[in-house]
């Protein structure tokens, strides 16, 4: 992939950009095999990759510069701002949005937050696009609600310029720390969730719910999990750390009992909406801590699917899964190091199948799906 920002030394986020994709995949596969070297693996499936540019459905832009000339991008470690509107990871559809946002910031008087001076209001612009209909969700992350009335007043102009903006919100993040969002979300549109669709499964994205940033590869990840589950004798499963329900909604069948657990209420609201649309009455989604839920249950499902954050599922949940002993565990991980550590804590299981998904091209990161079977 050619990137003018990288060539000019202005951005180094894509550390592997100079390597061809096949070389990147080989290096990632070697890393994964090294991490799982102590475990016999029955089947290594071929790695899955997607487009090498224009694949991201989300932009997280630090706002800097002045209210008249805002910059959207990032801050270097020394505080120097960098405009990343031309980043080739973004689809072409993002360019007109960034172009309209810059004059809008001036119109609404949204002074960019100055980290050094601890002054200003607009900290971040967060943009998400649906692959199914091109609709977009735009979030303004502000230090306070001081400029909220001005923003509301100026908003009709922006909506006229960009009718694709279906969901618009203000998030209040008052603390002087590099935290992307605060707890308070104020909706400026009637619509509160963005409609998405992977493999004919309706999914919903709300402002504070996690959603994969590479739809082309994520849809293949969910479809693969569905195929693996369909090959197993499973009538009852848990989907832990389920997010908006991507895995569970793909894997569920009308006669399957499925419980999805996620700590974020926003994500659970999305999952419930999708389940209702699909008419899947035996699906339950609850906003709880996954470990606390699992350890409080008396019943044992045949399959537990886990999709934890980078820290992994941790020893308490590993210990409980070992005791509870479901016949199958499917582990989806964005950090193979913590996954390998967790598998070490599950000695009663063997690795049946592993597949790497290149969710993050041009970086060392990847997603991996692993099927564990009780020994």
From Swiss-Prot:
Q: Which Gene3D superfamilies match?
A: 2.40.50.1070, Vaccinia Virus protein VP39
Q: Does the keyword Phosphoprotein apply?
A: no
The answer to keyword Nucleotide-binding applying to this record is no
Name the InterPro entries for this protein: 23SrRNA_MeTrfase_RlmC (IPR011825), MeTrfase_TrmA_AS (IPR030390), MeTrfase_TrmA_CS (IPR030391), SAM-dependent_MTases_sf (IPR029063), U5_MeTrfase_fam (IPR010280)
Q: Which GO terms describe its molecular function?
A: 4 iron, 4 sulfur cluster binding; iron ion binding; rRNA (uridine-C5-)-methyltransferase activity
**Binding of S-adenosyl-L-methionine, residues:** 212, 241, 262, 307
Q: State its Enzyme Commission number(s).
A: 2.1.1.189
Keyword annotations for this protein, in alphabetical order, are: 4Fe-4S, Iron, Iron-sulfur, Metal-binding, Methyltransferase, rRNA processing, S-adenosyl-L-methionine, Transferase
What's any GO biological process attached to this entry?
rRNA base methylation
Binding of [4Fe-4S] cluster, residues? 3, 11, 14, 87
Q: What PROSITE patterns does the record point to?
A: SAM_MT_RNA_M5U, TRMA_1, TRMA_2
Q: Identify the catalytic residues.
A: 334 (nucleophile)
Which reaction equations make up its catalytic activity? uridine(747) in 23S rRNA + S-adenosyl-L-methionine = 5-methyluridine(747) in 23S rRNA + S-adenosyl-L-homocysteine + H(+)
Report the family membership: Belongs to the class I-like SAM-binding methyltransferase superfamily. RNA M5U methyltransferase family. RlmC subfamily.
What PANTHER family does this protein's entry cite?
Answer: RNA M5U METHYLTRANSFERASE, TRNA (URACIL(54)-C(5))-METHYLTRANSFERASE
Known function: Catalyzes the formation of 5-methyl-uridine at position 747 (m5U747) in 23S rRNA.
Report the protein name in the record: 23S rRNA (uracil(747)-C(5))-methyltransferase RlmC
Q: Which organism is it from?
A: Escherichia coli O6:H1 (strain CFT073 / ATCC 700928 / UPEC)
- Read off the lineage from the record: Bacteria, Pseudomonadati, Pseudomonadota, Gammaproteobacteria, Enterobacterales
